[in-house]
């Protein structure tokens, strides 16, 4: 609790909002600038696929590309959702597969809706 003298000298610090990139939108469209790989934190080892994306509001973010294999290239349009990857620090967004220029995971049988795959008949 602040005293009156402390409030006179310094105003209260306002809390920052969590994500300025999305505001209240569930997804946002962006343009892929660069696709590269990154290694995860200590106990895990792999090459996770990452894309640098320029959003519609002119901000640049890093997003994780889920699933096995992708055909994402520079200058492709992608749809982004919120959601962090636990073993990649600083990556707070994911690419939605099967929408715009991103194709779904091929030959996927289970959890198809997460990876944008149509039902195989």
UniProtKB/Swiss-Prot annotation:
Gene3D superfamilies attached to this UniProt entry: Nucleic acid-binding proteins (2.40.50.140)
Pfam families, sorted: Ribosom_S12_S23
InterPro entries for the chain: NA-bd_OB-fold, Ribosomal_uS12, Ribosomal_uS12_bac
Intracellular or extracellular location(s): Plastid, Apicoplast
Entry's Gene Ontology BP terms: translation
One example GO MF annotation: tRNA binding
Keyword RNA-binding: yes
Statement: the UniProt record of this protein carries the keyword Plastid: yes
Gene Ontology cellular component list: apicoplast; small ribosomal subunit
Keywords: Apicoplast, Plastid, Ribonucleoprotein, Ribosomal protein, RNA-binding, rRNA-binding, tRNA-binding
Subunit composition and interactions: Part of the 30S ribosomal subunit.
UniProt similarity note: Belongs to the universal ribosomal protein uS12 family.
Function: With S4 and S5 plays an important role in translational accuracy. Located at the interface of the 30S and 50S subunits.
Name used for this protein in its record: Small ribosomal subunit protein uS12c
UniProt organism field: Toxoplasma gondii
Lineage: Eukaryota, Sar, Alveolata, Apicomplexa, Conoidasida
């Amino acid at each position: 609790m602040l005293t009156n003298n402390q409030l006179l000298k310094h105003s209260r610090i306002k809390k920052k909002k969590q994500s300025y990139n999305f505001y209240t939108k569930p997804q946002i469209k962006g343009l892929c600038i660069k696709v590269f790989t990154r290694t995860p934190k200590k106990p895990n080892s792999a090459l996770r696929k990452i894309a640098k994306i320029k959003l519609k509001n002119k901000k640049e973010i890093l997003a994780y590309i889920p699933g096995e294999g992708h055909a994402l290239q520079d200058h492709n349009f992608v749809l982004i959702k919120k959601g962090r990857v636990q073993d990649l620090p600083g990556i707070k967004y994911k690419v939605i597969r099967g929408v715009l220029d991103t194709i779904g995971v091929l030959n996927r049988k289970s959890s198809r809706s997460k990876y944008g795959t149509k039902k195989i008949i």
